[in-house]
């Protein structure tokens, strides 16, 4: 009996280990930090509807810096060894470069109103990584020995909130190879870092992904958010739909007037009922289809504003 009992315990432990190994893991993409890009002059000007902003130029960085590519490759290897799927920055930058300039401008078919999307938002939307690993580093040299000081941050690609971090300085080494110095520096902190990544993703699986829905009314529209349908104002109708479709009914109505509503901390499922991955645009399109059907019959233009934010404009397309 005791022998059978021990066999049962071993079997359960093996099943737990297999289940852990097969647990869903977040998709990662490694990028250089904004500070690193600025220090090494990898920046570009972006015209954000009349306001010039300086943003990282990842295309120039991965095309020019061998050090950056070596660092990204090493982190990719370290994370892949721990079972995390990865999106490669260089390949995603290339795919975005192949998109035509005309596709970067979205216009209303009726009014001609336009909204632009920044290269960084487009990169995140195209790559569809769950978490961005933001890396900055400095090589220190003392006599014949070198070490590396690093700062690795994990950012939720949808909410841009930091979910994990690791920083420190490695021990002095006679090796001059950057990937070796990086691996020596991060090895003591990597397991705890990975645990925090997985804990965040497990929370997303349980409580949904956090996104933002920005709702507006076209100037030419005959409808606003105070128009009533069967005794309920349109904004109440939308509130009820979100409550029915958000994970655990969780969302926050941050601001609202008769012509705009801002929903933050909208918790959407990671996966659709058919098992396909769910994103902000897909969730927003479900809401748009609901509003476009009877009894509302409201045309809705749905526009991506980055991976974790969507703009819905009611009244025309």
Predicted regions and their residues:
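C-terminal/domain-edge helix-coil "capping" segments
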Residues: 22-42, 161-250, 283, 294, ...
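Extracytoplasmic
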Residues: 23-25, 66, 70, 74, ...
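N-terminal segment of the mature soluble domain
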Residues: 42-126, 132, 232-271, 275-293
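Short, flexible helix-coil linker/hinge segments at the edges of structured domains or between repeats
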Residues: 92-110, 155-178
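Sec-dependent N-terminal signal peptides
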Residues: 3-15
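C-terminal basic regulatory modules in eukaryotic proteins
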Residues: 287-317
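Amphipathic beta-strand/beta-sheet edge segments enriched in Tyr/Trp
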Residues: 130-174, 305-317
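Extracytoplasmic/secreted cell-surface and envelope-processing proteins
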Residues: 38-41, 96-100, 142-145, 222-223
């Amino acid at each position: 009996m005791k022998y059978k009992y021990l066999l049962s315990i071993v079997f359960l432990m093996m099943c737990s280990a297999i289940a852990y190994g097969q647990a869903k893991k977040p998709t990662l993409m490694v990028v250089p930090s904004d500070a690193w890009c600025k220090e090494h002059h990898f920046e570009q000007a972006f015209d954000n509807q009349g306001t010039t902003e300086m943003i990282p130029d990842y295309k120039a960085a991965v095309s020019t810096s061998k050090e950056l590519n070596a660092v990204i490759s090493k982190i990719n290897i370290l994370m892949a060894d721990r079972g995390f799927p990865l999106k490669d920055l260089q390949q995603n930058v290339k795919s975005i470069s192949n998109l035509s300039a005309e596709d970067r401008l979205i216009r209303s078919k009726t009014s001609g109103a336009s909204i632009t999307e920044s290269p960084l938002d487009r990169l995140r939307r195209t790559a569809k990584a769950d978490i961005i690993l933001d890396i900055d580093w400095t090589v220190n040299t003392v006599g014949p020995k070198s070490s590396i000081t690093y700062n690795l941050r994990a950012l939720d690609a949808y909410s841009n909130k930091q979910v994990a971090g690791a920083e420190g300085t490695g021990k002095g080494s006679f090796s001059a190879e950057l990937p070796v110095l990086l691996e020596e520096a991060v090895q003591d902190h990597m397991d705890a870092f990975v645990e925090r990544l997985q804990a965040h993703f497990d929370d997303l699986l349980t409580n949904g992904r956090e996104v933002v829905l920005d709702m507006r009314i076209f100037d030419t529209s005959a409808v606003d958010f105070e128009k009533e349908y069967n005794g309920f104002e349109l904004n109440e109708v939308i509130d009820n739909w979100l409550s029915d479709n958000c994970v655990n009914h969780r969302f926050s109505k941050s601001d609202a007037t008769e012509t705009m509503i801002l929903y933050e901390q909208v918790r959407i499922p990671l996966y659709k009922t058919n098992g396909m991955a769910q994103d902000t645009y897909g969730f927003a399109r479900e809401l748009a289809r609901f509003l476009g059907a009877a009894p509302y019959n409201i045309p809705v233009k749905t526009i991506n504003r980055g991976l974790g934010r969507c703009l819905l404009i009611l009244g025309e397309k």
